[in-house]
């Protein structure tokens, strides 16, 4: 399970330090893709395989299922950690998440998310007021 929030900077070549605590569970190679809300989703290979199977099972006759599969899989790529603990974030993913300098890496349960600091701040400002309301709605899931 991934948790925590880490502040880092991405360099002009797209290299980003991945915190050791997260690397331990991600492994040496993992999958990054376009995430929702303007961030990147990062999955360990085992979790990616489970998700891939679920998404492949969606009915291809539904336009929304096809659209989501295209978006999700077309942005995906394998990332590896270098000797300095950095990953190279591909240009198309940096563009999707507006990663230019200051970056926030968060643990989000089964995945890691990578955000531009600006987007993360805006997301938190927007989401924080509804946190308790959402928690009340999720009570039905026996949390």
From Swiss-Prot:
Record-level GO BP terms: negative regulation of DNA-templated transcription initiation
Bilayer-spanning residue ranges: none
Gene3D superfamilies per UniProt:
Transcriptional regulator MraZ domain
Q: Where in the cell is it found?
A: Cytoplasm, Nucleoid
For molecular function, the Gene Ontology terms on record are: DNA-binding transcription factor activity; transcription cis-regulatory region binding
Fetch the CDD domains from UniProt: MraZ_C, MraZ_N
Question: Could you tell me which residue ranges the SpoVT-AbrB domain spans?
Answer: 5-47, 76-119
Keywords assigned by UniProt?
Cytoplasm, DNA-binding, Repeat, Transcription, Transcription regulation
Q: Which GO terms describe its cellular component?
A: cytoplasm; nucleoid
Write down the superkingdom of origin: Bacteria
Which family is annotated? Belongs to the MraZ family.
Q: Whom does it interact with, and what assembly results?
A: Forms oligomers.
Entry protein name: Transcriptional regulator MraZ
Identify the species of origin.
Heliobacterium modesticaldum (strain ATCC 51547 / Ice1)
């Amino acid at each position: 399970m991934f948790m925590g929030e880490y502040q880092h900077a991405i360099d002009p070549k797209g290299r980003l330090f991945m915190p050791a605590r997260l690397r331990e569970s991600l492994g040496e190679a993992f999958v990054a893709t376009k995430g929702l809300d303007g961030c990147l989703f990062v999955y360990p290979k085992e979790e990616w395989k489970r998700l891939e199977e679920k998404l492949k099972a969606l009915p291809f006759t539904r336009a929304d299922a096809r659209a989501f599969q295209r978006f999700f899989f077309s942005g995906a790529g394998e990332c590896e950690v270098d000797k300095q603990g950095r990953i190279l974030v591909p240009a198309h993913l940096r563009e999707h998440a507006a990663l230019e300098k200051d970056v926030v890496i968060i643990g989000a349960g089964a995945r890691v998310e990578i955000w531009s600091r600006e987007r993360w701040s805006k997301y938190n400002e927007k989401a924080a007021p509804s946190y308790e309301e959402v928690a009340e709605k999720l009570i039905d899931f026996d949390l």
